[in-house]
From Swiss-Prot:
Highest classification ranks of the organism: Eukaryota, Viridiplantae, Streptophyta, Embryophyta, Tracheophyta
Catalytic activity: 4 Fe(2+) + O2 + 4 H(+) = 4 Fe(3+) + 2 H2O
Residue positions binding Fe cation 2: 126, 175, 209
Residues binding Fe cation 1, per UniProt: 91, 126, 129
MF (Gene Ontology): ferric iron binding; ferrous iron binding; ferroxidase activity
Protein name (record): Ferritin-4, chloroplastic
């Protein structure tokens, strides 16, 4: 016991002795401890060292010096720029048609306020889509070029279907047409390797477009069930109070 205590005391004292050697770690049984041959702190993970001041030179040469040229533009081809401008025109045209439908159903001798509300909101939504595309065009360094808008119809009555069903079927066709145009825009982006434009179309438009087509398809089916009579009034009331009571 005395020998063990003395050995333990000597070991304890050696920890505080300035001349004592540091304790040697003893590897666990079955393990082999090897010292690292060299530090890996400065090794490149891929074997390629990034040299920003060298690699940025070619980009620096591409920075425009004329005031008319965009400074933000990068990997944004003319075809993509034109396709975005075309989609802006599509959104504005559809918005204009929906606005005409709003005006029709808001007439005193038509008086379907729910349908008027629905088409007014739809018109505003399409205009927002156009404005979002315009903002994106500027963000990528493109130039917004607004095109002419076709004058829409002012009357939407139909002898066989009635005005509500006729207008809703037209709206469904417009949403499907808009979806086709968006898919074309996405194809242009994909063809030119513009992953940012493709992501923008996917994130901001395509999913929402599918939802709109489904919603209006259900409205068409419901209007076909109720016919042109009293059921249209009940359908209109549903739209009027959808999302909260109307003023």
């Amino acid at each position: 016991m005395l020998l063990r205590t003395a050995a333990a005391s000597a070991s304890s004292l050696s920890l505080f002795s300035p001349n004592a050697e540091p304790p040697r770690s003893v590897p666990a049984r079955g393990l082999v401890v090897r010292a690292a041959k060299g530090s890996t702190n400065h090794r490149a993970l891929t074997g390629v060292i990034f040299e920003p001041f060298e690699e940025v030179k070619k980009e620096l040469d591409l920075v425009p010096t004329v005031p008319q040229a965009s400074l933000a533009r990068q990997k944004y081809v003319d075809e993509s720029e034109s396709a975005v401008n075309e989609q802006i025109n599509v959104e504005y045209n559809v918005s204009y048609v929906y606005h005409a439908m709003f005006a029709y159903f808001d007439r005193d001798n038509v008086a379907l306020r729910g349908l008027a509300k629905f088409f007014k909101e739809s018109s505003e939504e399409e205009r927002e889509h156009a404005e979002k595309l315009m903002e994106y065009q500027n963000k990528r360094g493109g130039k917004v070029k607004l095109q002419s808008i076709v004058m829409p119809l002012s009357d939407f009555d139909h002898a066989d279907k009635g005005d509500a069903l006729h207008a809703m079927e037209l709206a469904l066709s417009l949403e499907k047409l808009t979806n086709e145009k968006l898919l074309n825009l996405h194809s242009v982006a994909t063809k030119n390797g513009d992953v940012q434009l493709a992501d923008f179309v996917e994130t901001e438009y395509l999913g929402e477009q599918v939802e709109a087509i489904k919603r209006i398809s259900e409205y068409v089916a419901q209007l076909r069930r109720v016919g042109k009579g009293h059921g249209v009034w009940h359908f209109d009331q549903m739209l009027l109070h959808e999302g909260g009571d109307a003023a």
